[in-house]
Curated annotation (Swiss-Prot):
Enzyme class: lyase
GO molecular function: glutamate decarboxylase activity; pyridoxal phosphate binding
Full protein name: Glutamate decarboxylase B
Positions contributing to substrate binding: 60, 81
Organism: Dictyostelium discoideum
Protein family according to the UniProt entry: Belongs to the group II decarboxylase family.
Enzyme Commission identifier(s): 4.1.1.15
InterPro entries, sorted: Glutamate_decarboxylase, PyrdxlP-dep_de-COase, PyrdxlP-dep_Trfase, PyrdxlP-dep_Trfase_major
Amino acid sequence: MPLHIVDKHKSLYDNYVQSATTEEIAKFKLADDPNEPETIKKLIMDELLLDGNSKQNLATFCQTDLDKNIHSIMDKCIDKNMIDKDEYPQSAEIENRCLHILADLWNAPDSSDTIGCSTTGSSEAAMLGGLALKWNWRENRKKLGLPYDKPNIVTGPVQICWHKFALYFDIEIREIPMENGRYVMNSEEVLKRVDENTIGVIPTLGVTFTLQYEDVFSISNALDKFEKESGINIPIHVDAASGGFVAPFIQQEIIWDFRLPRVKSINASGHKFGLSPLGVGWVVWREKKDLHKDLVFNVNYLGGNMSTFSLNFSRPGGQIIAQYYNFLRHGRNGYTLIQDACAQQGIFIGKELKKMGIFDLIYDGTGALPGVCWTISKNLPSEPLFNLYDLSEKLRSRGWQVASYSLPSSMNDVVVSRVVIRHGFSRDLSSLFVKDVQNAIEYFQKHPILRSLEKDEGENFHH
């Protein structure tokens, strides 16, 4: 073993006189020798300064404003593995409480008779909901002696997890394209696409592209009528990744959840408007019978018998405990105050953007998710001196991260920008953002762009 002379005086003096910081470190392979932990921590934290400021990240749906108690909970739970329910029985009990709270929040007919599970996020939760649809449809087809080799789902413009689900599990996705003036699915378009092989219809409560809600109520009514005429019973799974923690508090008049008998399952993201740290999603079934028993595995090699349904295995427990903390801390009234405050900022920004006379609002912040979505008006007297990719790039120089992207499929020629308003975004910040947008427009007027950014250069669509 080689001997190394350590200059203790230098190592104790300053992090920035040690070799780990004065020389190039190994970045793509494991170094031979260890380093002082504080020096390496400092080096990494310096690199992370190049990341964007999360408070100004208006592109993400994920929660970035977390109180000190959540940080403490996450620290205390860093070693808890949620799959080890026999070793961490109280953590498992807390997970169970969260599921029943959600079942009650989403108006399950009997929240004590429902079933569900936590996940790493709403994408995994959505896939589990989709798998349950497939298994139930396949069993029904087998009982009737009918073929079951061509399952399909009918969706609006969905988040990419549904395309992954369709590809990974060999299911046809019938995605209803947007049209000018219609950016979400509606019941008429659904009925054009459903048939005996449709395992489920997947409306989204908060479409990623525009923040709008799809009308679960009218879709359910249309499927009721379709069943009376055809005898084909098609269930609904609601992708409420964002809206599942918004609509129950500030849009209670919207009927989208288990109040509709056709809604068999709902997924949501705890780390979006559920106010929890990254890494927790939820899926809840209307009744236990809606989750096919063949999808549930029973394992006993962790010290006790337990049931599991997931696409992974080991998972940290801190996010689930933090979700429970949020439920207890905020309650219904607290969540209502928070989500309404977010919604008001979105409405304010929408009104201010409209006043500028250059933008058309696709979504003005009312009636769905907190935020706003806009495009450059096509009715301007002359061509604008910039595009939305240019605007996003200019705003980035002030620290703002704004998602700009083209809409999918048949609306691909329409470029939009979107901001999502999350807990922790004040009216003061909203006003500063609007001012920076106005300043950017004035800058482009004084300094015309010779070549605007193209889609592949400027698109920054954050799911």
